[in-house]
């Protein structure tokens, strides 16, 4: 693999936050998916998140009631959520928390501007594509909302950032990148970036930071350069990620080995 130059192919790609994060998780997984273009399998966490996103979207775009959403959740869960959770406790937690959120669902505190809004832009010649789950407005201010199955924590505001602060910042990068398109369309950046952590349930509203915005743009350019210059695409063999998060496991020569390294 090291003697083949994939840079022209990589430079010609349209980028997304998930495409870059896939490389950070495992360069070989990225190679299988985006260079060899193999079709991955549906797994529990990803398909659960997709199912919940579709139901929340239907609440706003189709006017579905809580009762209708709960009925769909119960009747279609087995069909729409593929794979297996790591254990029964995790399955029960995800299933129950999803149902409870839909049972008590209520509108975000903003006037909807767009649902599942497609965003496209170029940054230093890099084409980028994404989708904003919910774009809202309140008193002239714009808010970007992302629905998350991940249980993020609000910023602690401690002098030294905690691990949960760092995790929040890593997820905020995606919304800062989406803000490039928002600024291009509306002439101003969002006032806040928000996470609807529906399993908690917790709604996090993070004030927009111009410095973090600048750093996110730099991150995009830096990561694309890093991926374009990659030649080895080495695997990152972590038991949990390989077994429960990697959709390429059926094609991966390292998968069996990753399951032994516990």
State each model region's role.
Residues 1-262:
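RecB-family 4Fe-4S metal-dependent nuclease core
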């Amino acid at each position: 693999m090291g003697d083949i130059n994939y840079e022209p192919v990589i430079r010609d790609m349209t980028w997304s936050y998930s495409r870059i994060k896939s490389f950070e998780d495992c360069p070989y997984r990225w190679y299988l998916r985006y260079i060899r273009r193999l079709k991955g399998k549906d797994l529990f966490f990803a398909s659960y998140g997709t199912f919940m996103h579709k139901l929340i979207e239907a609440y706003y775009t189709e006017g579905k009631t809580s009762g209708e959403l709960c009925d769909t959740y119960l009747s279609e869960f087995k069909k729409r959520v593929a794979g297996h959770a790591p254990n029964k406790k995790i399955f029960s937690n995800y299933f129950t928390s999803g149902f409870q959120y839909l049972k008590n669902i209520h509108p975000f505190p903003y006037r909807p501007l767009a649902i599942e809004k497609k965003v496209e832009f170029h940054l230093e010649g890099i084409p980028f594509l994404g989708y904003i789950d919910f774009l809202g407005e309140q008193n002239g201010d714009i808010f970007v909302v992302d629905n998350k199955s991940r249980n993020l924590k609000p910023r602690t505001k401690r002098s030294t950032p905690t691990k949960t602060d760092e995790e929040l910042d890593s997820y905020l990068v995606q919304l800062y990148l989406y803000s490039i398109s928002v600024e291009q369309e509306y002439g101003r950046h969002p006032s806040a970036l928000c996470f609807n952590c529906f399993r908690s349930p917790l709604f996090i509203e993070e004030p927009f930071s111009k410095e973090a915005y600048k750093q996110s743009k730099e991150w995009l350019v830096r990561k694309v350069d890093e991926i374009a210059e990659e030649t080895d695409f080495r695997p990152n063999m972590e038991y949990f990620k390989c077994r429960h998060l990697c959709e390429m496991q059926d094609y991966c020569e390292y998968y069996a080995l990753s399951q032994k390294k516990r």
